[in-house]
C-alpha cells in the first residue's frame, strides 16, 4: 500500500463521516436517542468491515466511516459491530 492509496483511504473515511452525519440529520429529528439500532447503518458498517480486509479497502473505509459520523447518540453500536467484523476477519486471515 503506497502513500497515495493510504491518503485516498483516509479521505474516503472522512467523506463517509460527512455522509453519515447528513443521513442522521435527515432521518432523526431528536438530538439523542440511546435505544434502537439503525439497520441500514449496521448493514453498511458490517459490509465496510468486510471490504476493509479485501482489495476494495478504500470503499470499506468509506462505508465504515458512515456510522461513525452520525449524530451523537446514533451510530455507536453500528460502528463497533463493523469494527469488530473487520478485526475478526483480519485476525482470521492473519
Curated annotation (Swiss-Prot):
Domain of life the protein comes from: Archaea
Cysteine disulfide links: none
Chain segments annotated as transmembrane: 1-21, 46-66, 72-92
Keywords associated with the record: Cell membrane, Membrane, Transmembrane, Transmembrane helix
Any one Gene Ontology cellular component term annotated for this protein: plasma membrane
InterPro entries linked: EhaL (IPR019211), Prd_NiFe_hyd_3_EhaL (IPR011305)
Bilayer topology annotation: Multi-pass membrane protein
Keyword Heme part of the UniProt annotation: no
Subcellular location, principal: membrane
Name of the featured protein: Uncharacterized protein MJ0518
Organism: Methanocaldococcus jannaschii (strain ATCC 43067 / DSM 2661 / JAL-1 / JCM 10045 / NBRC 100440)
Lineage: Archaea, Methanobacteriati, Methanobacteriota, Methanomada group, Methanococci
Amino acid at each position: 500500500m503506497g502513500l497515495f492509496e493510504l491518503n485516498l483511504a483516509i479521505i474516503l473515511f472522512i467523506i463517509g463521516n460527512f455522509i453519515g452525519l447528513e443521513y442522521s440529520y435527515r432521518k432523526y429529528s431528536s438530538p439523542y436517542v440511546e435505544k434502537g439500532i439503525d439497520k441500514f447503518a449496521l448493514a453498511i458498517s458490517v459490509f465496510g468491515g468486510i471490504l476493509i480486509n479485501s482489495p476494495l479497502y478504500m470503499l470499506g473505509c468509506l462505508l465504515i466511516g458512515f456510522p461513525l459520523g452520525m449524530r451523537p447518540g446514533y451510530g455507536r453500536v453500528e460502528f463497533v459491530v463493523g469494527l469488530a467484523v473487520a478485526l475478526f476477519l483480519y485476525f482470521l486471515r492473519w
